[in-house]
Amino acid sequence: MALDFLAGCAGGVAGVIVGHPFDTVKVRLQVQNTEKPQYRGTLHCFQSIIKQESVLGLYKGLGSPLMGLTFINALVFGVQGNTLRALGQDSPLNQFLAGAAAGAIQCVICCPMELAKTRLQLQAAGPARAYKGSLDCLVQIYRHEGLRGINRGMVSTLLRETPSFGVYFLTYDVLTRAMGCEPGDRLLVPKLLLAGGTSGITSWLSTYPMDVVKSRLQADGLQGTPRYRGIVDCMRQSYQAEGWQVFTRGLASTLLRAFPVNAATFATVTVVLTYIRGEEDQVDSEAAPGASTTPAGPALAQPSSL
């Protein structure tokens, strides 16, 4: 189990590095003023950030997700695996329930982390910056708003993450079974990448409107008096002012991000598991009495261990 946590964390780091620029663009598109929009679309937003803030502008708020990454991956993989074993049967329904449980519990870390990330991503470049970094952002929020401020957007995060992780693990399970992912398959890694990337896209599509609401609630009040009284009020005001399209704002950059992020994540997880398990097998074979002198090759990871 500890090995799964380690591999998952390594994969998560790779995924964050690949996907964070897309996330920055997504957040800015979601919360920009519709009456005087600063960006015309995903590509224009990318170009504007790079031109005005350099490439580093795309990585604003990176420290926050990296800080919480170890704990989030440990929770997700640990809770999902233990819940699945507790349910007793590896079925599609149980995969969904186990994933949903993992998604709900990791919100304890995910919500404050995304709050800091969102506020840093919206922060303008220059000497007048309100926050020096992720930790400083959270400290200042706590000083001014208390524990409630740190957990701003928790309910909307729960409503997004719980079904999203359920859909993710369900889709991944169905795809790996359908593609016949088995140890020793020469195409195992590409299959895992395809399954992971597709699962990421599917999970985002399933709960994206709630992600828009979550981003708006977490950014609310930065420019003065808060506009929204809660989730329902945010949805109502957003719909009345901008129509149903508001709930798809930033979707293009999110889907562009979803596949490569999950591809990077699962590629890294596979490499880490394959290497470490290969080393362990070799050590075990050398330590065992009468063991063969031919070292065993590293076995590719079982899909269920990811």
Swiss-Prot record:
Q: Where is the composition biased (Low complexity)?
A: 287-306
Q: Signal peptide position in this chain?
A: none
Q: Principal place where this protein is found?
A: mitochondrion
What InterPro entries does this protein map onto?
Mit_carrier, Mitochondrial_Carrier, Mitochondrial_sb/sol_carrier, Mt_carrier_dom_sf
User: What are the protein's GO molecular function terms?
Assistant: basic amino acid transmembrane transporter activity; high-affinity L-arginine transmembrane transporter activity; high-affinity lysine transmembrane transporter activity; O-acyl-L-carnitine transmembrane transporter activity
Instruction: Extract the coiled-coil ranges from the record.
Output: none
Keywords of this protein's UniProt record, alphabetized? Amino-acid transport, Membrane, Mitochondrion, Mitochondrion inner membrane, Repeat, Transmembrane, Transmembrane helix, Transport
Q: Does the keyword Membrane apply?
A: yes
User: GO cellular component terms?
Assistant: mitochondrial inner membrane; mitochondrion
Location of this chain's protein in the cell: Mitochondrion inner membrane
SUPFAM superfamilies attached here?
Answer: Mitochondrial carrier
Q: Where is this region: Disordered?
A: 283-306
Residue windows of the Solcar repeats: 2-86, 90-178, 190-275
Output this protein's name: Mitochondrial basic amino acids transporter
Name its species: Rattus norvegicus
